[in-house]
Swiss-Prot record:
Stored Gene3D superfamilies: 1.10.287.70, Cytochrome c oxidase, subunit III, four-helix bundle (1.20.120.80)
Membrane topology: Multi-pass membrane protein
Domain of life: Eukaryota
Identification of the protein by name: Cytochrome c oxidase subunit 3
Thylakoid listed as a keyword: no
Gene: MT-CO3
InterPro entries attached to this UniProt entry: Cyt_c/ubiquinol_Oxase_su3, Cyt_c_oxase_su3_dom, Cyt_c_oxidase-like_su3, Cyt_c_oxidase_su3-like_sf, Cyt_c_oxidase_su3_a-hlx
Location(s) in or outside the cell: Mitochondrion inner membrane
Role this protein plays: Component of the cytochrome c oxidase, the last enzyme in the mitochondrial electron transport chain which drives oxidative phosphorylation. The respiratory chain contains 3 multisubunit complexes succinate dehydrogenase (complex II, CII), ubiquinol-cytochrome c oxidoreductase (cytochrome b-c1 complex, complex III, CIII) and cytochrome c oxidase (complex IV, CIV), that cooperate to transfer electrons derived from NADH and succinate to molecular oxygen, creating an electrochemical gradient over the inner membrane that drives transmembrane transport and the ATP synthase.
Amino acid sequence: MTHQTHAYHMVNPSPWPLTGALSALLMTSGLAMWFHYNSMLLLTLGLMTNLLTMYQWWRDIVRESTFQGHHTLVVQKGLRYGMILFIISEVFFFSGFFWAFYHSSLAPTPELGGCWPPTGIHPLNPMEVPLLNTSVLLASGVSITWAHHSLMEGNRKHMLQALFITISLGVYFTLLQASEYYEAPFTISDGIYGSTFFVATGFHGLHVIIGSTFLIVCFLRQLKFHFTSNHHFGFEAAAWYWHFVDVVWLFLYVSIYWWGS
């Protein structure tokens, strides 16, 4: 690395992809164990492994980018392309859930009563908690944009304030979603309606939690003066991801909550 004559970052061997894959296996197996055998041991182990992996992987990336200067303009360009491709893959991921929903709702089978929502299902009122959730996420989209503009202008105080507001709104959204799940008059086992509703909104909720974690890391980094107006890709990637989560929710709200009810 001392005699490097190019702008690319030759990454050192890292154990974190392996421990990350292991934690994913433990969490998915743990979910199955929790659903079928009411045991949370494997799920807890998976979550702990995942959190430790995230902490140490993020620590390495922060060290390489902020303190060692490995994230040159060329490397940042590659990271941008990577994040864009990741978000595109997420678009296709959610497209599958929308496909399942519309496939079932546009031509409901006789087993469902020939109608949508199926006979016996009482859907949630889209003008109550779901509408509040929509306004909360839209407000968070405004505040994350405010944070980005403040960072570009070098206004650290406003950037931290806006980022804190965004994180708070993300946590509030998660709490509202949890209360909605708790009070819902149907479950994930209530046929195709319950399956599509909880899988689509549940995966979106998981993405909100991931996005909130991403923003919390950015907030802690900004407290330590890691970002400048021309070197802040970590925050930029978090903002892109958050806007993606916002847009997915709008489609979910219109499709599943409003039209689907």
